[in-house]
Amino acid sequence: EDINRIVYVIPALDGSLLVGEIYQYGLLDDNIELYSQMMPALMGVDEMAGYLVNIVLRIMPNADLNTILDVVAFDLVNDYMKYSTLLWGLVPSGNYEPCREMYLMDDSMAVIREQTDWFYNAQKNSDANIKEAVSQGVKVFDIVDYNVPLYEIIDSWDDVNADGVIHLDSTSMGAYSVGVAKELPKDYVSTVNNCTNPNHDHSDPRNIVDANTGLLPCTTFYFYNQNHESTGSNDVIMKLVSE
């Protein structure tokens, strides 16, 4: 009763594929992308340093390097990530159950498993809970960044649209897209329309996103080519949030 307005700003309502796939599959396993994409991404903004690392890594056999990365990812999850309920909260619902079987079934993980199971159930019911809040008069808004690829450290980095960190389906509560800078097929027909006002037009002028499939098309704002990290410095977004 005390909440009358909710503003989501690039929310991870269904986690981030970056986290989910690291838990479930480890790091990127494609040799070409490994050298050209992942290492520069891991080195951050210093691309030169990333490519210098690539030169050194190319001396190593591909199989050896992939084995090393698999071990690093496995140890990272087993020694640190599996104990963090915060990070478990960023595992998408589609990744949770197999990851739960992999890391949480030991008796020593019972306390953490209880908490992550609770969050997983809340995650699955997120859309229903938001719709219920709207029906009770709560105004819910969503700010979505899109058309920036996920960091190239997981195998499916190029399979979804994203803001660099969180995939579009999670931030937009279900908006459909084929991928970054990929137009919807000419024969595409939306099977979901969450806008009940026939006078509204939520079509993407670039034909990249079907906003009608998002849970709240009338109160969701999309920012093209906006990456996750610089959202806080976007004056338009900050003004929307504060008003």
Stretches with model-predicted labels:
Residues 2-243:
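Lipid deacylating catalytic domains
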